[in-house]
């Protein structure tokens, strides 16, 4: 079974039109730029007639040189990283050790005779691609759709957008690479079904489960490893060559390993001088890495509810290795789809989406998902989840919150990310305060809170209080992002601690209910003691003391029983007078509504 039947265009006449938008695949190892017109895609070649440009940046003779396989490489791995993260991650530190300014308080590299940010260096790649496109198409280009790994955090996405902006691009949309690949396949026919996109690039691995129904592409689950790719396979082969043939661990040996990998993709053996390696050895060397990626894919499928998949879509040049196709078939027993050149599938999708955004001619819709739940901290440290994990984006959710104490003139908002039940166990994203609220009884102030995630995965939170007409909006800053490794750890911790978290939340909710009840009743009694007899006051105080003792003991069953006893005895012995108190203080609420 095939998703599409498609041929790569050889010579395509692209009509000149008023608006032009390109698709860009800014890859860890290689980058591509393409344009689409009427669903026909053309990958734009460089001056040396190559469609694929190595993502390397060199600086010589006061000029930047892109794509000569010298200088700084794999810069994509650095997007969204802090100086501390790079210093503490050997794989990242090795990329920039010759350029890193370790005495700086921020991440800057000593590059091009100055201290320069990562986004400024990456912008040179975008400038190069932009110049190539303008030269080939003989027109000015400013609009682009750019692809990013599915697990790029806000920090990384922000740096991609900034780099593109520095290069002179207006970014129409950031789309996940697996989503772009599915777009490239799906738009060419009206296929329905569920597909696993297996994207193994030079430096990142992404897997997505996509539901394709009548032009709608919905990512229902994502996973991956943003520190794994074809580069790691090159390292494994390099280590083998060094050990087996006593070669130095050098750039030349690494290049030899790359050549061996590429040759063994379509041949059974590779020979170079006195060095020989066959496909069987290659497969033995890389099998653990391949199995690791398949385990991630299977876990992603489980997250999506284990739907029946109709095929696996291959993305990334590394997927040409026969072992990968064989192992994927063994694992999933479905067709392995690779009709489009796996190096170009992502940029095809980006170009098609760019064309659609400037001249919509299709009903197709791309939907990515939220990788971790987003919510707010409530009184007592409880997390109220507002946007759940794997919710399709863009999305906006509105909820109403109220004050906990009397005469509050401000509400503090703590935005959280994670699957745990208590704020202390989740990741803090941002804090802000809604100030200038009128002093009123607890529960009378209502704040309308909106969580919104745009198509680029950027979160903004706004709060609005109607009585005072007070509002506040915050966009989560990029340095609050989270990478794929942290996502996996957080999900694992949430799973392991699910029962404990649930019990802790129930206890905290019981304590909060007890405190609210005590505060409300004591406040009412202080204002309206003349309505109650001494014996009634004594009974109420005794019952409240029981609730206080249970809350202090942090015994949920005891708390619930003491509250139940309070309600039962109060309703039986002093229903009329207590109702007067409650109606006067809580304005229409009965005791069961006190929160």
Curated annotation (Swiss-Prot):
Can you supply a Gene Ontology BP term from the record?
Answer: iron-sulfur cluster assembly
- Disulfide bond positions: none
Q: Per UniProt, what is one Pfam family of this protein?
A: HSP70
Q: Does the keyword ATP-binding apply?
A: yes
Keyword RNA-binding found: no
On the tree of life, the source organism's domain of life is Bacteria
According to UniProt, the name of this protein is Chaperone protein HscA homolog
Gene from which this protein is expressed: hscA
Lineage runs:
Bacteria, Pseudomonadati, Pseudomonadota, Alphaproteobacteria, Rickettsiales
